[in-house]
Amino acid sequence: MKHSKKLFLCVSFLLITIFIGGGGFMNKDESKETEIKKSFNKTLSMYPIKNLEDLYDKEGYRDEEFNKGDKGMWIVHSEMNIQKKGKALESRGMVLYMDRNTRTTHGYFILTKIKDTGKVKTDDSEKKYPVKLENNKIIPTKQIKDEKLKKEIENFKFFSQYGNFKDLKDYKDGEVSYNPNAPNYSAKYQLSNNDYNVKQIRKRYDIPTEQAPKLLLKGTGDLKGSSTGSKNIEFTFVEKKGENIYFTDSVEYTPSG
């Protein structure tokens, strides 16, 4: 009887230990998810940036990599990537380099087509069209004969100009990953087609699927908020072998040198 009682107590203690330990892991995951949200919120709280030239007067998070007197540079990037089943991956996007020292911006509208042979991905083509930003308008700096393409470039809007993450704190049940040695971190959330940002992306791009996307917040560098590293967001609609549809966006603050 004593033996049975001891065994019962040991098993009970073990179960309590596992339960508490498991709760501890859950709390750690929840805590890390909160940290990741806070880290991204430093950038995403700026969205929507209606006038990109406002970034000339906005300073990001600095560290020892910045030289004294360097006001830094904002790098803004948005890109839509579509690979229909069995076809090449086609990307359309733009990147701007906004120098706060000179208050000038240059960048490129970029078209790429990448073919997956099954063994290796090869660049079939990449076309870059130089642009500048003046009075919050994208202006091609070289002649473009294709009027449709020219209009697409002039009317291009970065996700950071229309996206809104005011409800980021309410996103729940994220798949969290954190590697302090790399360092890198991420959080992934399943969205619905009723999500505000999903509606905005669908409004601007012809997305050949009704499937609702997953949102991936992906960062490198110090999770506590160093200016080194990067923060990227990705809306993944389809991710299969030979078929991919995803949208990427980033706003980074770096030394201008």
Curated annotation (Swiss-Prot):
Subcellular location: Cell membrane
Topological category with respect to the lipid bilayer: Single-pass membrane protein
GO cellular component, one term: plasma membrane
UniProt keyword annotations, A-Z: Cell membrane, Membrane, Transmembrane, Transmembrane helix
Transmembrane segment boundaries: 7-27
UniProt KW Transmembrane helix keyword: yes
Top-level taxon of origin: Bacteria
UniProt family annotation: Belongs to the staphylococcal tandem lipoprotein family.
Protein name per the record: Uncharacterized protein SE_0114
Native species: Staphylococcus epidermidis (strain ATCC 12228 / FDA PCI 1200)
